[in-house]
Design a protein with these regions (language model features):
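A short Gly-Trp-Pro
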Residues: 1-127
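Single conserved hydrophobic/aromatic residue that forms the stacking wall/gate
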Residues: 125-142
Length: 142
């Protein structure tokens, strides 16, 4: 596995091959804004079978803007959000790109929930820009 990431304190670590990443996205939904404390979450879609997690995650469940139950996994010790998934889609993990040891290779494919994006959250995209998926919903499949 050629990529790794971790929580702030290092109690939770994860590993995957970047070739196994399905896609990457900026999500501007209110739930992601609240859990990140900023204007968006940058997430990588990875099949659950392609990621290995060492350490114990604690999960908080809430109804997401998509209408699905989102299970948000975070470190019990430092509180860093590491990954999440929709309870209705357990075979797909959403890894927080900011927890990667090296995120320089990440290329964002699309943007979700732009209708709830804040004007103060500048969009610093390089060409080509990620495509905006409808502005109000997350795609139903990866």
């Amino acid at each position: 596995m050629n990529q790794s990431g971790r929580c702030q304190c290092g109690n939770v670590n994860y590993y995957f091959d970047k070739e196994k990443v399905i896609s990457a996205h900026h999500c501007h939904c209110k739930d992601c804004q609240r859990t990140t404390g900023c204007g968006k979450a940058t997430i990588l879609y990875i099949a659950s079978k392609n990621i290995k997690v060492d350490g114990k995650l604690k999960f908080f469940d809430s109804k997401g803007s998509s209408g699905m139950t989102i299970r948000r996994g975070f470190c019990e010790n430092c509180g860093s959000g590491v990954l999440s998934y929709a309870k209705e889609l357990p075979l797909l993990k959403f890894v927080k790109a900011g927890t990667l040891e090296d995120s320089s290779w990440v290329k964002v494919d699309s943007v979700f929930f732009t209708k709830s994006a804040n004007q103060w959250d500048c969009l610093l995209y390089t060409s080509p820009s990620p495509r905006d998926i409808s502005g109000s919903r997350m795609p139903s499949s990866a």
